[in-house]
Amino acid sequence: MAVQKSRVTPSRRGMRRAHDALSAKQLSTDPTTGEVHLRHHITADGFYRGKKVIQTKTSAVEED
């Protein structure tokens, strides 16, 4: 069982936890569709940086 050698001070504990904070997701808006998506990811419609890069099931049905 792990046992600490000496007590950890509140300052040391706080310095260790300084990098544990959560940050908000970086979101972008697609210029073509206006859809919000994660940075460097395609939208649900299959657009990336304003261009259609992948054929989605919903767009295949709409084209028929």
UniProtKB/Swiss-Prot annotation:
GO molecular function terms listed in the Swiss-Prot or TrEMBL record: structural constituent of ribosome
Region (Disordered): 1-35
Keywords: Ribonucleoprotein, Ribosomal protein
InterPro entries, per database record: Ribosomal_bL32, Ribosomal_bL32_bact, Ribosomal_zn-bd
Any GO BP annotation: translation
Database matches in NCBIfam families: rpmF_bact
Cross-referenced HAMAP family: Ribosomal_bL32
Family under the similarity heading: Belongs to the bacterial ribosomal protein bL32 family.
Protein name listed in UniProt: Large ribosomal subunit protein bL32
Originating organism: Stenotrophomonas maltophilia (strain R551-3)
Gene, per the UniProt record: rpmF
